[in-house]
């Protein structure tokens, strides 16, 4: 099992996230773009990702929350901007409320997720762009790296089940 690699660039407020998964591009793409599969891996344990609405298309969105073991809900919204099927998609991600309104008290970010065949499976490269160095630092302090790596471990388990 591969480990998630993070490269921060404070000169352009980006974080490059790379991970290889043992699955085909089609399997990994589905896991990132279908709500029933996202529910199986997106949230770091012991949280669960619960989709309220999802419309994976340019101009669509994914409105979801992470449900904590104590019943707490952390709402998020991902607006899909551009999609090249089975290759990449971009989106604007933000914390939100249950109605889908952005929570401007917490930093948002722009994602470009790229899927390529390589090695034993599929390499996913995520370029996360922040509005400022301070926003990148705040998200990092909130546990982004640890949480995303845990979610990636969940995805590894899901891909084994999909074989």
Predicted region positions:
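Solvent-exposed residues in well-ordered beta-strands and their adjoining turns
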Residues: 20-24, 67, 83, 116-118, ...
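Hydrophobic-ligand binding "helix-grip"
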Residues: 44-48, 52-58, 67-119
């Amino acid at each position: 099992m591969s480990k998630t690699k993070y490269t921060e660039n404070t000169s352009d407020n980006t974080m490059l996230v790379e991970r290889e998964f043992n699955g085909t591009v089609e399997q990994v793409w589905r896991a990132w773009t279908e709500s029933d599969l996202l529910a199986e891996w997106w949230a770091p344990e012991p949280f669960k990702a619960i989709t309220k609405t999802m419309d994976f298309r340019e101009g669509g969105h994914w409105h979801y929350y992470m449900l904590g073991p104590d019943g707490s809900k952390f709402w998020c919204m991902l607006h899909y901007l551009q999609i090249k099927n089975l290759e990449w998609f971009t989106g604007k991600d933000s914390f939100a409320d249950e109605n889908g309104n952005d929570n401007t008290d917490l930093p948002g970010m722009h994602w470009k997720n790229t899927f390529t065949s390589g090695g034993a499976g599929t390499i996913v490269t995520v370029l996360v762009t922040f509005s400022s160095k301070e926003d990148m630092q705040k998200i990092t302090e909130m546990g982004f790296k640890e949480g995303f790596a845990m979610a990636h471990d969940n995805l590894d388990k899901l891909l084994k089940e999909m074989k």
